[in-house]
């Protein structure tokens, strides 16, 4: 009978086979000293206490105690793979970036797919946006495109990002997911309507990672060899076709195969069924941006394809699984501020906030020298700068080269060719409230023109099935927002909520303890 076991299930067997007739390695401590016995402690007699000099034990246990690093605040659960990006169409008229240098050029890439709100052990089949981050290892340094599987996002101002994420995670007292928190935030910020509608549509639960699109989401700026800038958006369209899971399928898989996304991707690559995506851009001139009826840097809106058609660029192919998950997926760090010449940020407020936040969280999670880790190292370029030392520096620390600038000793020099493009800014400095920007027009188009009748029906059912857990006043506020999009949208959700509420499915109030002073008295503690 043929062996039908999956490659992922046979990983240990395949690893052994890859070593052919090699002898097992000599077992050592972390310091490389041979170990004679890995099964038994060094004790005084068979029943005696452990000796402090049992360095084999202390070496093992001390390292075990420090195995875990901080989990990502968002996108904690993820799958990774490696491959290449190949240029199929010339866009050098728009960008001088070396990744687009000529047709046929291949650039090594690393990709990480992820859910957003769940912890590292959560299921891959939850209703949640999916991260779609790509690291291009180019000759001008790494380019990190930190996208999602949706072209829009919940908020347009980075000031709101921490509160948005808090609302999606666990209640600080009950440590449970809380529909009140989720829907209170969404209902108070109608700009979330577009992404919420996308999230609760059929595309809210992709069938693994291979059958979904990816988007840079933000607006970026491309600059050509003549230093002529143009705004752009990036798109990855899956060549496997869009495929989604039903709620019932997702619930079943969350119990039977919670790592379904990782599992599916690993097996496809291990069996030579390499997933691929076609890479496109949209472009908008500065003059068009000035005239367009909405803010082109608003992350809650798309650029309509009829106005700004997709321009094909190349192909992204994944053909290698990680050799080690921790080393190549857990430690990979994507940073939107990694942009080689030819690619620059736009005034997109969310992008501007991420330019700081992402490298900052990597320094917290992985350390100041995280870019020296092999998976993050810009190995196609030569790193030469004036950064030195720091925890876990494991390069040569740039040897005896000067560590100050300017200097007279032939150390790294400025590269005028890499100068950022010029742009004019003239406005008053203030905190501008964008909450009343048009939050419904594109959502109305999505509801009435993109979705079919059956898809609208499922959208409203999915929303009501989740919103029913929130307090009635929050439900009313959310329904008002849906009604602003289209009366039919609000009416359908309200009708379903009325049914749920009549059946007693509305939120039960959980009594919580409130600490009124800086100290808890003994009597208070006794009643906790």
From Swiss-Prot:
One of its GO terms (biological process) is hydrogen peroxide catabolic process. Its cofactor is heme; NADP(+). NADP(+) binds at residues 194, 201, 203, 213, 237, 303, 305-306. Residues 1-32 are annotated as: Disordered. The lineage of its organism: Eukaryota, Metazoa, Chordata, Craniata, Vertebrata. GO terms for molecular function: catalase activity; heme binding; metal ion binding. Keywords: Heme, Hydrogen peroxide, Iron, Metal-binding, NADP, Oxidoreductase, Peroxidase, Peroxisome. A motif (Microbody targeting signal) lies at residues 525-528. This is Catalase. It comes from Glandirana rugosa (Japanese wrinkled frog).
